Amino acid sequence: MKKIEIADFVIRLLTLAALVCGGFWAWYQYSESGSTDWQNNITLKTEVLPYLGDMRLLVIHVQSKNPRPNKFELQSAKHDSFELRVRRLKPDAVEGKVFHEDEGDLIAQADLLKLAGGDYEFLPQAEMDDMQAVVVKANTWVSVIAEMKIHTGTRDAHGQPDIDENSTSTVVYIPK
C-alpha cells in the first residue's frame, strides 16, 4: 500500500508541475513576449536598368516578413500606412554633411497599403514582396525609404494617437 501512495503522490506532483509550467508558458506568451504585438522585418532590394536617354529605371523590391507566430493587419480604415518614398539627395553637399533618411527632394511616393486594396494581412512567418519602378535621371543619388505605421488604438502620454512604426532605408546611385 505504501508504494501506491508514493506513486499517487509523485503523479500529483508531476501534474502540479505541468500546470505550473503551462501557466508560466501562457503568461510569458501573452504578457511578456506580447502575443498581440506585431513585428515586421522590412528589407529593400534595388536594381537600376537603362530606360530612355539619360533616364534610368529604379526597380525597388520592398520585402516584408512577419517573423512572429501570430498574424497582424494594416488597415487604412484605422489610419495605418505602408509607404515607399524616393528622394533625390543634393549633389553639391560638402564633406561631413549628414543626410537624414527623409531629407531631399521627393521624386516619387507610393502608398503600398492603398495598392493592396487598403487592407494588408501578414500571416505568421509570411514573406511579401511589393515591387515598384521609378524613372530617375542618370547620375543621381537617391534615398529610398519604406515605412510602415500601425495605430495601436490607444493614446500616448500627451493624448495623441499611439503609433508603432517600422522602417528601413537605403541610398542608391543611378549611374550614367
Where are these regions (language model features)?
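Membrane-aqueous junction of the first/signal-anchor transmembrane helix
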Residues: 1-176
